[in-house]
């Protein structure tokens, strides 16, 4: 009992000290992120057509906020809103920037997460981003912008991400994420406005972020189920005829009352133990006690107790409760009456409340 109490205290302290990987349900969070973006698909073809070099990598950053809808059984679900500078690609000629493609916009996504370790989630996001793409061209090597050649588009793009998030504290989390944005913008040359060059790249980025979670407080501790143990003892002379294993009709009311109490115990495990007095051979007494235990167990199974949740064992004359009380009793009838407490069936029920 003392060891069990200590174990429950230790478990409670451990649960209180570990931050949940995902925020608590029905709470908000907000954060910032930064990293490196890389443009793919179409950039090389555009640079070749314009006869310029290109630079695909750039700095990216953003802000985000979310609402935690679900956090149960290691599974989390949140909705996230953010605004990003998605990065820029540059056309280069003789070491100078001659063209620039920049992107920024808002995005909305669903974020599903799974807790793999205490405080550590892996997650995936899927959503949509409304992206403004600006195409800037420069008329000379000094970087003077030609406003006549400037263009911009605003288009919806698919947004996807995978990452890992670790709760440093219940209120503070860090994340590492890879995000990709599909088919960004659609560049059209000014001299051919109805013709689209195949340039609407994908943008991949790797970001590190930090977020603050509002209204976390202490992580909820789930109380351990209360253990329930009950023991019932049946006088065999009331339950069975002497030397027999068949239940008497009047035993039904007693067994039904015990079954009513057993049914209040959750996840109950039932152990039925049969005992006899010391009269007779050991072999006969073990056999009789086993048959009596089986009769009681079968009655409970017929009432609804699962067969794999109940066991029956006959112990014969073992563990007498009369001790030496009847040692001086003379005569068979008197001895049988004195040893009546030893002829019993004990029922032990263990489960939770």
From Swiss-Prot:
Site annotation (Part of salt bridge gating mechanism) points to: 80, 175
For the OmpA-like domain, which residue ranges apply?
Answer: 227-353
CDD domains in UniProt: OmpA_C-like (cd07185)
Entry superkingdom: Bacteria
Entry membrane topology: Multi-pass membrane protein
Q: Name one GO cellular component term.
A: cell outer membrane
Identify a single GO molecular function assigned to this protein.
Answer: porin activity
Please list which residues make up the signal peptide.
1-21
Record localization: Cell outer membrane
Segments spanning the bilayer are 27-37, 58-69, 77-85, 104-115, 120-128, 158-167, 172-179, 205-213
Query: What InterPro entries has UniProt attached to this entry?
Result: Bact_OuterMem_StrucFunc, OMP/PagP_b-brl, OMP_bac, OmpA, OmpA-like, OMPA-like_CS, OmpA-like_sf, OmpA-like_TM_dom
Q: Which GO terms describe its biological process?
A: monoatomic ion transmembrane transport
Coiled-coil positions: none
Query: Cystine bridges: which residues?
Result: 326-338
Q: Which UniProt keywords apply?
A: Cell outer membrane, Disulfide bond, Ion transport, Membrane, Porin, Signal, Transmembrane, Transmembrane beta strand, Transport
Q: What is its main location?
A: membrane
The family assignment reads: Belongs to the outer membrane OOP (TC 1.B.6) superfamily. OmpA family.
How does this protein assemble? Monomer and homodimer.
* Swiss-Prot/TrEMBL domain comment: The extracellular loops are most variable in sequence, and in some bacteria confer sensitivity to phage and/or colicins.
Q: What does this protein do?
A: With TolR probably plays a role in maintaining the position of the peptidoglycan cell wall in the periplasm. Acts as a porin with low permeability that allows slow penetration of small solutes; an internal gate slows down solute passage.
Q: What is this protein called?
A: Outer membrane protein P5
Natural source organism: Haemophilus influenzae
- The gene from which this protein is expressed is ompA
């Amino acid at each position: 009992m003392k060891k069990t109490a200590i174990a429950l205290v230790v478990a409670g302290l451990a649960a209180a000290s570990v931050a949940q990987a995902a925020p608590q349900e029905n709470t908000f969070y907000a954060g910032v992120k930064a990293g490196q973006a890389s443009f793919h698909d179409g950039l090389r073809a555009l640079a070749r057509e314009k006869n310029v070099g290109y630079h695909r990598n750039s700095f990216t950053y953003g802000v985000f906020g979310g609402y935690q809808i679900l956090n149960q059984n290691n599974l989390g679900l949140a909705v996230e809103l953010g605004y990003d500078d998605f990065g820029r690609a540059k056309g280069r000629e003789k070491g100078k920037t001659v063209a620039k493609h920049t992107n920024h916009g808002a995005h909305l996504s669903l974020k599903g997460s799974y807790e793999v370790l205490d405080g550590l989630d892996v997650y995936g996001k899927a959503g949509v981003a409304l992206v403004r793409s600006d195409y800037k061209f420069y008329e000379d090597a000094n970087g003077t912008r030609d406003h006549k050649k400037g263009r911009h588009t605003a288009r919806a793009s698919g947004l996807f991400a995978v990452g890992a998030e670790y709760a440093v504290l219940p209120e503070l989390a860090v994340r590492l994420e890879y995000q990709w944005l599909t088919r960004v913008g659609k560049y059209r040359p000014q001299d051919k406005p109805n013709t689209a060059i195949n340039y609407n790249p994908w943008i991949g980025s790797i970001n590190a972020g930090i977020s603050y979670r509002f209204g976390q407080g202490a992580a909820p501790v789930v109380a351990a189920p209360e253990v329930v143990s009950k023991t019932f003892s049946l006088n065999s002379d009331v339950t069975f005829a002497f030397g027999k294993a068949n239940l008497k009709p009047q035993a039904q009311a007693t067994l039904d009352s015990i079954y009513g109490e057993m049914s209040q115990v959750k996840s109950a495990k039932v152990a039925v133990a049969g005992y006899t007095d010391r009269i007779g051979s050991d072999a006969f007494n073990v056999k009789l006690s086993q048959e009596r235990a089986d009769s009681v167990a079968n009655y409970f199974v017929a009432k609804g107790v699962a067969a794999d949740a109940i066991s029956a064992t006959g112990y014969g004359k073992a563990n007498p409760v009369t001790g030496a009380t009847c040692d001086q009793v003379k005569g068979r009838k008197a001895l049988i009456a004195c040893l009546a407490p030893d002829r019993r069936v004990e029922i032990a029920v263990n489960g939770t409340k």
